[in-house]
């Protein structure tokens, strides 16, 4: 005889979670109605007279279909599984019972994915993003730590199928990096990485210390979305200081021959962007301006939320963020200080295995 009560309880649990998503989390009825409207618009013969609008509608349809179709599949699947369980019990058929369990696993996975995607509800969560890394005080040790973080995030992005483009790298005095900016390209890049803003603390026996002593160093990460060119961010040219300089770091044999690198400082906020990945000063300036626009947008969003944030948690350091994760390599322990998630597989994390930390922070609503 089968243990059917645990299976019935699981079916009920999945049904309840699906109902929650269908209701206030996803607003299924409104999205289904909107999907029908979008489909009708896309079927109009003159829709491609406005290519940008047509593309926006296509993207909206894809998002709506993901939600509506998945919920339809979940509801139908749970109905089918309930019927399958009844058949298994009536026929005392172990094979059918096992098939029921397998189908539940598939449905649970689909539901989990949709629940997780619902955490990406921010205005720019679907956008590409920029990641700025800055070595803290500590000289060569901190600069080496910044380069380790860059490698870690590049590996993570590659593992998730994101494309990356290094916008700027400033070499350290002896080793590592003083700073770096990387663009991460792909759907939900910002949604995935937005909780990584903050200070990362490294504790290890320094390879740069002849005495092999333990050192603590810090590097900061700042993640901000790529914003549309038409977003309403006013930049007064009089507020800008634009410097050109010779590029450093990787870039080919011609990289240091001309002053093609560009640094832009927004004087009222002291926000700085820089780009050196192209040999054209003009292209580097355009890219740096695009980053400045994105940073100013993020700055304005943080200002709007600052009062609320202070009321909710006076301990949080708005802007670059407070310390978020500790990497103690001698003790083989990496711990997220916000969620409590930790692992002893330090090398895997430094090789880009960040999902457990990122998912926990997103689920915690950080």
From Swiss-Prot:
Gene3D superfamilies according to UniProt: 3.30.160.20, 3.30.70.1660, Release factor
Keyword Cytoplasm: yes
Keyword S-adenosyl-L-methionine: no
Protein's GO biological process: viral translational frameshifting
Posttranslational modification: Methylated by PrmC. Methylation increases the termination efficiency of RF2.
Cellular localization per UniProt: Cytoplasm
GO MF term list: translation release factor activity, codon specific
N5-methylglutamine: modified positions: 253
Keywords, sorted A to Z: Cytoplasm, Methylation, Protein biosynthesis
Pfam families attached to this UniProt entry: PCRF, RF-1
More about this protein: The gene for this protein contains a UGA in-frame termination codon after Leu-25; a naturally occurring frameshift enables complete translation of RF-2. This provides a mechanism for the protein to regulate its own production.
Function of the molecule: Peptide chain release factor 2 directs the termination of translation in response to the peptide chain termination codons UGA and UAA.
Annotated family: Belongs to the prokaryotic/mitochondrial release factor family.
HAMAP family the record matches: Rel_fac_2
Protein name per the record: Peptide chain release factor 2
């Amino acid at each position: 005889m089968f243990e059917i009560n645990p299976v019935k309880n699981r079916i009920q649990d999945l049904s309840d979670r699906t109902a929650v998503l269908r209701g206030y989390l996803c607003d299924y009825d409104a999205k289904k109605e909107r999907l029908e409207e979008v489909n009708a618009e896309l079927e109009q013969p003159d829709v491609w007279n406005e290519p940008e609008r047509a593309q926006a509608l296509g993207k909206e349809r894809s998002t709506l279909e993901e939600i509506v179709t998945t919920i339809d599949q979940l509801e139908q699947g749970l109905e089918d599984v309930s019927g399958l369980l009844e058949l298994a019990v009536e026929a005392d058929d172990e094979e059918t019972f096992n098939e029921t369990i397998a189908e539940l696993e598939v449905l649970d996975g689909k539901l989990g994915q949709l629940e997780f995607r619902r955490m990406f509800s921010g205005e720019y969560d679907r956008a590409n993003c920029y990641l700025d890394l800055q070595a803290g005080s500590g000289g060569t040790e901190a600069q080496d730590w910044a380069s380790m973080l860059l490698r870690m995030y590049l590996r993570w992005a590659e593992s998730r199928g994101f494309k990356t483009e290094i916008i700027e790298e400033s070499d350290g005095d002896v080793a590592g990096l003083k700073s770096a900016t990387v663009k991460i390209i792909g759907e939900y890049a910002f949604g995935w990485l937005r909780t990584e803003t903050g200070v990362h603390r490294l504790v290890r026996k320094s390879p740069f210390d002849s005495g092999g002593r333990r050192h603590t160093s810090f590097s900061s990460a700042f993640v901000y979305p790529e914003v549309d060119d038409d977003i309403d961010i006013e930049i007064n040219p009089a507020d800008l200081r634009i410097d050109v300089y010779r590029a450093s770091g990787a870039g080919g044999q011609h990289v240091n021959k001309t002053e093609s690198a560009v640094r832009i400082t927004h004087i009222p906020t002291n926000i700085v962007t820089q780009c050196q990945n192209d040999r054209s000063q003009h292209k580097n300036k355009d890219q740096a301006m695009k980053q400045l626009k994105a940073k100013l947008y993020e700055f304005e969003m943080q200002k709007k939320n600052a009062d609320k944030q202070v009321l909710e948690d006076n301990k949080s350091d708005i802007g670059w963020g407070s310390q978020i994760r500790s990497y103690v390599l001698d003790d083989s322990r990496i711990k997220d200080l916000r969620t409590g998630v930790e692992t002893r597989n330090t090398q895997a994390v430094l090789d880009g295995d960040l999902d457990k930390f990122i998912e926990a922070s997103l689920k915690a609503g950080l």
